[in-house]
Each structure stands twice: as structure tokens, then as C-alpha cells.
């Protein structure tokens, strides 16, 4: 499915969300099993925190750059629905880039040059970042704002 053009954007959206969840886990626990996390076995090795951050920065850049604004979308998107409830691809792109910005800020004390490189790149295209509450990432079901899950607010 990953190489099937009809699912191109949906795969990238899933990867953006996967990286968001991994970013939450790494910020809480530090090094975690990421590179082999989904392989069967009891003894999955832990990855270094810095390696995970670099991998997420690369993954999110590839996802944001790879989204095709006229491509496929989820028919029902509980996070960034458009007016028709399908995926709002521009908001997914903004989310991926804003998450990259957050990760770059997190690594600035450990690798200032990498952090500066990423931040400078993102600020050159500030229109591709979350800029208002309309861009917020909220996991919500239905039309009722009270049905959102506050754990996933970004």
C-alpha cells in the first residue's frame, strides 16, 4: 500500500501521526525502541534519543514535502477535517512542519547547528507552519467540540 499512488497522501498522513506519537514518547522516556519497534520479539533494542530525533526530523520533512495537495485524502479525518470531513492536506503539512520546529527546539542544546538549520529552513516558509488556532491539532469525533480528546491537543 505504501507505494500505491492511490494511497500516497494517506500513508504520509499516517507517518506524520506516527512521528507525533513517537515524539510524545521520546519526550517522556528518552530513548525508546523505534527503529525496530514493530518487529516481533521480546528483546527489541532501544534507540538513542538523538537518533530518534534526527529520524523524526527527516521523516517529517519527507512527509510534508511529499503531500500532494490535489491527491488522495481520508474520507473521514478526525484530526484535520476539511469542510467535507475529508482530510485538510494543508493543515497536515502545517502540522508536520510545526512538529519539526518543536523537535528542532528540543535538540538545540545538544546540536545547535542542526537545530538552527531546521529552524532557518522552516522560518523561510512560515506560511507552512501553524499560525492560528484554526490550525490546531485536535482529535475530535463528530461536530461537537466537547468530544475532543485533550491528551492529543497540540
Positions of PLM-derived features:
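Structured, solvent-exposed acidic/aromatic patches
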Residues: 1-154
Amino acid at each position: 500500500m505504501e507505494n500505491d499512488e492511490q494511497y500516497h497522501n494517506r500513508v504520509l498522513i499516517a507517518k506524520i501521526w506516527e512521528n507525533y506519537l513517537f515524539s510524545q514518547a521520546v519526550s517522556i522516556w528518552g530513548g525508546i525502541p523505534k527503529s525496530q519497534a514493530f518487529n516481533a520479539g521480546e528483546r527489541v533494542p532501544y534507540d538513542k534519543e538523538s537518533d530518534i530525533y534526527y529520524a523524526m526530523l527527516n521523516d517529517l520533512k519527507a512527509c510534508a514535502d511529499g503531500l500532494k495537495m490535489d491527491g488522495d485524502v481520508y474520507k473521514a479525518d478526525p484530526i484535520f477535517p476539511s469542510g467535507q470531513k475529508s482530510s485538510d492536506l494543508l493543515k497536515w503539512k502545517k502540522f508536520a512542519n510545526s512538529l519539526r520546529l518543536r523537535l528542532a527546539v528540543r535538540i538545540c542544546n545538544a546540536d545547535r547547528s542542526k537545530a538552527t538549520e531546521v529552524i532557518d529552513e522552516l522560518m523561510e516558509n512560515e506560511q507552512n507552519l501553524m499560525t492560528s488556532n484554526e490550525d490546531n491539532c485536535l482529535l475530535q469525533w463528530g461536530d461537537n467540540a466537547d468530544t475532543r480528546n485533550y491528551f492529543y491537543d497540540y
